[in-house]
Amino acid sequence: MRFCFLLAVLVSANALSDEAAHARKRWAESPYGPMLERILPPTFNAAHLPEAGSDGAKLARRYCVQCHNLPNPAMHEPARWPRVVDRMVVRMQGRGNMGTLMADMMAGVEAPSDEERIALLAYFRRNGQAPIDHARYPELERPSGEAFRLACSQCHVLPDPRRHTASEWRAVVARMQQNMQWMNRVVGSHPIQGEPQLRIEEINAFLAKYAKR
C-alpha cells in the first residue's frame, strides 16, 4: 500500500513537471516570450515551494508557470495576495488591461476553476510574507538596520527575521541578491560615490541577530 502511494505521488510529480515544462516552452517561444520571461526572476523553482506536496503548491506549478516563472508565495504579504490572484485569473481568462493583445497572449492558457482559485489563494496567503513589526525592531532605524531596510523594501514588505534561522537567511539573501541583479536593482557590484550599495554582510548580521533559534 505504501509503495502504491509513493508511486502515485511520483507519477503526479512527473506529470506536473512535464506540464510546467510544456507551459514554459509555449510562452518562451511565443512572440511575447521576452516580455513574459522578464515578469519574475528565474531563481525560485518548485523545490523551494513551501508545502510542496499540497494542492496549493500543485496549483501554483500548474497555472502560474503558464505565463511567467514560478512565483514565491513570500513575494507578497497575505493581505495583498487576493488582488494579485484575482488580477492573474482575469488575465488567464483572456481579459485584463491590454484588450485584444491580452486575449492573444493568453491563447491556449487554462484558467483555474473557482474552487481551484480559492485553494490557490489560500495557499499563497498561508505562506505569504509576514511583515516585520517595526515597533519590535527599533534597530531598523539605526545604522545597523539600514542595509536590511533599504535593500529588502525595494521589492516587498520587510520580512520578519523570525521567519528563518540564520543559516536559512544566508541562502535567502543570496537568492535575493541574484534577483536584484536580474532586475537591475541596487546590488553594489561597482560602488559609485553617492549611490546606495548592497551591503550583504550587514544584512545577514541584522537577520542573524533576530533569526529563529
Language-model regions, residue ranges each:
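Electrostatic cytochrome c docking/interface patches
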Residues: 23-58, 126-147
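C-terminal capping alpha-helices of c-type cytochrome domains
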Residues: 106-135, 190-213
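Gly/Gly-Pro-rich "capping" loops immediately C-terminal to redox-active cysteine motifs
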Residues: 55-57, 69-94, 154-182
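Sec-dependent signal peptide recognition
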Residues: 1-6
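Inter-heme linker and motif-flanking segments adjacent to c-type heme-binding CXXCH motifs
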Residues: 71-76, 126-139, 158-167, 209-213
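Extended, hydrophobic interaction surfaces within ordered domains
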Residues: 18-22, 78-127, 180, 184
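The canonical Cys-X-X-Cys-His
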Residues: 61-70, 120, 148-159, 203
